[in-house]
Amino acid sequence: MAKTKRVAAFILAAITIFCLAAGVKYSGAYTLYTFATAKRKLPIYSVEREDKKIAISFDCAWGAEYTDELLSAMEKYNVKCTFFAVQFWVEKYPDYAKKIVGKGHGLETHSKTHPKMSKLSRDEIKAELTSSKAAIEKITGRKVTLFRPPFGDYNDKVITCAEELGLYPIQWDVDSLDWKDLSADKIAARVLKRVKSGSIILMHNNGLHTAESLPLIFGPLLANGYEFVRIDDLIYKENYEIRSDGTQIKK
């Protein structure tokens, strides 16, 4: 019996030490597990705003055959947007890059080669960003200030490298899933259901039904008082913080 008590006491002591080290708090009859963890660095998923400004964005990597239709729809509805392009897309379609910027839209970096950025070293990450940034700026004559990680893949290292280069890392809070070749109606329904003031919508310039879905998105949202702006006009540039859900808020 004495041996059993000694073993039980040892186990209890070990558990107590573990809990204290891990940051576990004990509160009477229930144990509240609050493991202490370092705060993860996050990109901007959305912005806390009450003015009904939102942003629609298009990732550009593999083609351009629907880009004219996208631009026509935005011109018809007087909508501004942001394109995130990889370097090889901009170099393959320089006329589209110039056309996008010429119509008042944003053209920002989506990396040089579309890798999984979290798998790269710091030097490799910075090479991807500096090369693509320089290529876009050379072709368009417009400064690049935003970066969207390919595949939405990032870690603290990726975010830190982007920030050190003066780039705001951008994600999204509304995924249209247009890359799955959903119908225009289904794409629009997803967006309309999820959008709110300060939302950033993810789409792709080469989605099969993306261009067709735009009037179904623009019409209802504009009628409800929403305003589509470029992401660089949506986000706060200073005196801000990012909540754990990726929402950028003013301090």
Describe these PLM feature segments:
Residues 1-57, 72-81, 197-251:
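Terminal accessory/targeting
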Residues 23-30, 50-56, 84-90, 143-149, ...:
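Short, mixed-charge, low-aromatic patches
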Residues 30-120, 124-138, 236:
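Active-site beta->alpha N-cap acidic-glycine motif
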Residues 69, 91, 115-251:
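Catalytic domains of cell-wall/extracellular-matrix polysaccharide-remodeling enzymes
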